Amino acid sequence: MNLTLRVWRQQSANATGSFISYQAKDVTPDMSFLEMLDSLNEDLISRQEPPIAFDHDCREGICGTCGFLINGVAHGGQRGTTVCQLSMRFFKDGDTLTLEPWRARAFPIIRDLMVNRSAFDRIIQAGGFISAPTGSAPDANAILVRKEDADTAMDAAACIGCGACVAACPNASAMLFTSAKITHLNSLPQGQPQRDERTLSMVVAMRNELFGSCTNHGECEAVCPKHIPLEFIGKMNRDLIRALWHRHRQPLVIPSVVQLPSAEDSHEQLHDGVGAQPQEDVHQQRHEEVQAHVQAESPEPAATAPVSS
């Protein structure tokens, strides 16, 4: 079959890009989408034209390197399929396909369909690890893990960090990715000592990378090739509230001006509130204290030895 490809071509992050049309000829249904692009690139090179740049590595849907939009849908729209696994049998002769890179401020374009996803790496570096004493490997059965917790951790660990969730989200949110990485370790006994620190650090890192906020569209789950569920975002939010509470909780110290009236106080003084701070002022003061804590920077990670994978 023959296809028309409208491909986004851009030399660098600072260059001006545009769509350029190409003809992909003699495409067989047994080809993968990337094999079709390989064939097109060979034709471009033979004509001394620059080939189309795109990310790829394992081509087995494992590494998360590949990924771009096909007709506005991440990975082409086949449920649970990365673009490297996408078969050309899903397209028809004469189709026009529009290819463009992930669109997000946190993913600057490197060239053509390639984007810089190092923002994901920095989120993982902020807390995507566990720490343990160095030495010989512990017995495999020394720390028991419940079946439910192991299943949750395994489901979260399936995230390959391809970035489709960010590309599909109207706000370019990375909450599905971040929640998967947090839930993976927070679900295991080995991840409990640094659970609060991990959650706070990774959420702060995500915010600093200028990703958007989640507004419950659910587009991220719909395009995720590994079926990462939205419930992990809920788990992350609960862990974040838990971490903030543990970090900032302290006894509510009632200001000394708030006193119960003694027997000698007159009824007029009690009625007029003389000697007492209004209750709403106390609540407002406490609210401002908590807000100030929440806006503070997260603590530095503890200097511990990370476990090698």
Language model: regions and residue ranges:
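Eukaryote-biased recognition of intrinsically disordered, low-complexity regulatory segments
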Residues: 1-21
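Short, contiguous acidic and Ser/Thr-rich linear segments
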Residues: 20-31
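Ferredoxin-type iron-sulfur electron-transfer modules in oxidoreductases and energy-metabolism complexes
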Residues: 31-50, 97-278, 286, 290-293, ...
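Short, structured protein-protein interaction patches enriched in aromatics and acidic/basic residues
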Residues: 53-65
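Extracytoplasmic entry segments of secretory-pathway proteins
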Residues: 59, 81-85, 90, 267, ...
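Glycine-rich phosphate/adenylate-binding loop and adjacent beta-alpha elements
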Residues: 70-94, 99
